[in-house]
Amino acid sequence: MMETERLVLPPPDPLDLPLRAVELGCTGHWELLNLPGAPESSLPHGLPPCAPDLQQEAEQLFLSSPAWLPLHGVEHSARKWQRKTDPWSLLAVLGAPVPSDLQAQRHPTTGQILGYKEVLLENTNLSATTSLSLRRPPGPASQSLWGNPTQYPFWPGGMDEPTITDLNTREEAEEEIDFEKDLLTIPPGFKKGMDFAPKDCPTPAPGLLSLSCMLEPLDLGGGDEDENEAVGQPGGPRGDTVSASPCSAPLARASSLEDLVLKEASTAVSTPEAPEPPSQEQWAIPVDATSPVGDFYRLIPQPAFQWAFEPDVFQKQAILHLERHDSVFVAAHTSAGKTVVAEYAIALAQKHMTRTIYTSPIKALSNQKFRDFRNTFGDVGLLTGDVQLHPEASCLIMTTEILRSMLYSGSDVIRDLEWVIFDEVHYINDVERGVVWEEVLIMLPDHVSIILLSATVPNALEFADWIGRLKRRQIYVISTVTRPVPLEHYLFTGNSSKTQGELFLLLDSRGAFHTKGYYAAVEAKKERMSKHAQTFGAKQPTHQGGPAQDRGVYLSLLASLRTRAQLPVVVFTFSRGRCDEQASGLTSLDLTTSSEKSEIHLFLQRCLARLRGSDRQLPQVLHMSELLNRGLGVHHSGILPILKEIVEMLFSRGLVKVLFATETFAMGVNMPARTVVFDSMRKHDGSTFRDLLPGEYVQMAGRAGRRGLDPTGTVILLCKGRVPEMADLHRMMMGKPSQLQSQFRLTYTMILNLLRVDALRVEDMMKRSFSEFPSRKDSKAHEQALAELTKRLGALEEPDMTGQLVDLPEYYSWGEELTETQHMIQRRIMESVNGLKSLSAGRVVVVKNQEHHNALGVILQVSSNSTSRVFTTLVLCDKPLSQDPQDRGPATAEVPYPDDLVGFKLFLPEGPCDHTVVKLQPGDMAAITTKVLRVNGEKILEDFSKRQQPKFKKDPPLAAVTTAVQELLRLAQAHPAGPPTLDPVNDLQLKDMSVVEGGLRARKLEELIQGAQCVHSPRFPAQYLKLRERMQIQKEMERLRFLLSDQSLLLLPEYHQRVEVLRTLGYVDEAGTVKLAGRVACAMSSHELLLTELMFDNALSTLRPEEIAALLSGLVCQSPGDAGDQLPNTLKQGIERVRAVAKRIGEVQVACGLNQTVEEFVGELNFGLVEVVYEWARGMPFSELAGLSGTPEGLVVRCIQRLAEMCRSLRGAARLVGEPVLGAKMETAATLLRRDIVFAASLYTQ
């Protein structure tokens, strides 16, 4: 075709091409161009150079011509070695611990060795990262003290643990396995496997052995010699024996390998039986502290420790139980000598060559106890957040948080632990840190005995019972009855030298309350106020006076105490600012002698010499030195730690005569005073002002009275304004102290630490908490009741539900649901404001309780008690009111028909109508009618009360009573199915959706009940009773199962919500396995989610160490405030980024259902000390930091110390995640923070 043909031309001759030579500037180079009209020359110096394209250059160098790279040199090129085939390497196994050992068999009498036998060793394959057993090998020496977040904790005491011993000592039934058909052909997790189907092969010769025959006579369980001999006895020729075995003794094949494993597990894995409980499961054993111990030295001829004094009775009883290795709970008054019990436990551990841990709630108390115990025992160590002294000692002193960390991290110190001493146990009531005590008590292993030291608490037996059930051991409770030094309580109303004698006894040393003293104080105050009003006019009294009034009050009080030789005195003031003001206002007061001044001066110089020069010139140091020289001291959280220790030591020496302190001084070592003064009986608890609780008052007042020096202690309450009410004083001074209450709450650290251990569950931790104790202490009774109900249910006869009774189960369930729905609606009505308003005098109601069944009544009077409202109601009844429960109304409706369920079917008297007056609770009223009667409630009640007396019993009722009864009877006869009632939605204006939906559901159920067919059967009553009995038993069984299950836990919904938060953020997977982020969070001491997110978001790695420290101060600072505008832009951006991450976490928490709002979560961050920490990390002296913030020096020090602990946690977390750069920065940040006065060594450790 012509369209497809192409013209083929010959190639052009190169000589015919129009080539032109172009000179390239002045370079001497030429270029041939095949372009018509090309120029004869270019620029004078050629084209300007241009940057080559990087991508083209890289491709040219590395891809197009890579030969120039030294990588491709022959000497560096990759070589391949031929693998040598070694089939025998498949038989090699890795080195493993020897699972057996040789044990000598000796003659029982002579001890002569008769032979050796091989015994299996236990726990040879355990490690700290796979087992919770105490028999696992110790971890690395570097981790023996603190443990490691990747290690497992030791098994908590009191929990059921299936041990290896149980598996080895059981009588294992010999199970024979068919090695031809019972083996798996598809490995777990694979879709395909090996095909072992029989093939067409010639039948093997009779003399060949099968695998089953070869393995049958092997003694895999290590049987005795007789069995081995029996197996090996020749029964004939060798060939005959072997060939006859498979035929004469065929293998008994199991139906399934899974069944076999389950059968073995059911017979083998059995939780160990709990120790035999005491009678009636009495775990808390009260000990009579007044019963003398006459044979003390006969029972303990060589005590582990002796004192220079004779121990008290309660101390001897506690020591006797310690010798028996019992756990004790000593609840004694302040300064009664609880430390004696701790000292004996420490001495006993040293005698046994074991270890003791002494825990305290605060670090300052740990330092003080370290000094005291070191002076007594010598071999004592101290572990706090920033100090580690003698960790190898037999007695270690630490805070409870550190012990919790050691327990979770599997520290090997726990192995040698014999005693754990919990001091100040009443601190468990602390909202923030009380949960730590419960965690530690739950996680302690079984071999550790517990010593609890506490002030007197009313529920010591209950708390001990919880610990006893928790650990399955008896706890002996020893309480003191009286104080060693009785107290006298006074009211002081003076305010000048003329009135310094106005001291009125209110509560004497025998505990008698003197109303005379109270009224005398009131009269003295009134008289002075009237004179003041006559001179200066009336003035409203106040609780707190001004500085001038305070100065007059304290000068007059201290003058009176000094005259009576009642110094030293501790003045408890519930404000840091008022402490400083009151001490500073006493400029004219000097209470020390010249020799005491010299001693104070030398002590101050010696203690302050360890500080740098500028730190010794701090305003607080100079001011405190001046106060101490005059015998005054101040002690609160705003004081520098070294100054607080100086004040404490001088006070213990008697050189501080007057100490103004907050209530934290009442917690700690025994530092009693002659007198204790309360500046006020009201305090601010963080949310509101309130009176002191009895426990708080007793704890602080207990510092009065020095044992062995004072016959009585003096407690004085200042009345600067009006005298407090007598009832308030009586409740505060003589009321019962606060009970020990659970503050258990879920934290992400707790959840992650338990989730990483398969054998421990968070639900078990919640079950064993003190908050669940009231509902869990009857678990054994619930189990017994459940077993009895199960047996009873099995003995019941099945109801016949054939024919017309086929819908009997539905009818029963409809009736039950209708009743529950009606009760719910009525409960909502009674809880509403409009519902309670409608229940006024004269309202007609339907009464339904144990005595009355749907009887009409009229409300006569409405009153309120401490819990709910009480309605005094006149109710219709038979005449006379039957006292036999079998004759009452409800019995007639034992088998409910539709008319009984739908509507009320009001009670009508069978004979003459009578009435009674009863007190009803809101739940006793089944309905509120629309009818209101005009009644005179007072007259009716008065007449009814009169007729209850024997001599007026036959008097006729008043006309008001008769009229009310006739109105009720007429209303019941007119509406036998129930009078009109108030509609909860239309009449009472209830907008609750549950009420609206409940009303709709109730009407639907009424229609279903009226259409039921079972009620028409003559067998309905008998079969209904059978079904109801069965359903009631099943319902009770479901209730008991619920109480015994995890679903009844109070914190279970929150636990699921927090796990969902962790799953959303990627800390755990769908199966609950802890991922890398979760393991990093376990290493954090606080703010675990926020710190982990900041680390994984790379928000810290790009910052300098001082900037990281400044940002993290927002997580530990307790002083609210803004960061200010003088910060570098890097810090401002960092603060915004931290808040953004916190907001994201808060939003996830809200999305998962937690109650904490995003604003509350972000509001926990306080960046008020960012600039202070930033400048401190950059090297600014502490003396120059005061101008950057108005925060007290003590709080600044506290913030920096906690910040250094957080930096160490982040350093360990960075190493765990593989971030050496961040770890190095955190190490640098901690080093920058740890300097000068902030980290000055405690005086107690020198």
UniProtKB/Swiss-Prot annotation:
Motif (DEVH box): 423-426
Primary location group: nucleus
SUPFAM superfamilies in the record: P-loop containing nucleoside triphosphate hydrolases
EC annotation from Swiss-Prot or TrEMBL: 3.6.4.13
SMART domains referenced in this protein's UniProt entry, alphabetically: DEXDc, DSHCT, HELICc
GO cellular component, one term: nucleus
Any one GO BP annotation for this protein: rescue of stalled ribosome
EC class of the enzyme, as a word: hydrolase
Domain Helicase ATP-binding: 319-475
Binding-site residues, ATP: 332-339
Region Disordered: start-end pairs: 220-246
Alphabetical keyword list: ATP-binding, Cytoplasm, Disease variant, Helicase, Hydrolase, Nucleotide-binding, Nucleus, Phosphoprotein, RNA-binding
GO molecular function, one term: RNA binding
Cell location: Nucleus; Cytoplasm
Residue ranges annotated for the Helicase C-terminal domain, each copy included: 585-755
Catalytic activity, as annotated: ATP + H2O = ADP + phosphate + H(+)
Impact noted for substituting residue 765 to I: In a colorectal cancer sample; somatic mutation
Modified residues (Phosphoserine): 245, 256
Function: Helicase component of the SKI complex, a multiprotein complex that assists the RNA-degrading exosome during the mRNA decay and quality-control pathways. The SKI complex catalyzes mRNA extraction from 80S ribosomal complexes in the 3'-5' direction and channels mRNA to the cytosolic exosome for degradation. SKI-mediated extraction of mRNA from stalled ribosomes allow binding of the Pelota-HBS1L complex and subsequent ribosome disassembly by ABCE1 for ribosome recycling. In the nucleus, the SKI complex associates with transcriptionally active genes in a manner dependent on PAF1 complex (PAF1C).
Subunit composition and interactions: Component of the SKI complex which consists of SKIC2, SKIC3 and SKIC8. Interacts with HBS1L isoform 2.
Family statement drawn from the similarity comment of this UniProt entry: Belongs to the helicase family. SKI2 subfamily.
Descriptive protein name: Superkiller complex protein 2
Annotated organism of origin: Homo sapiens
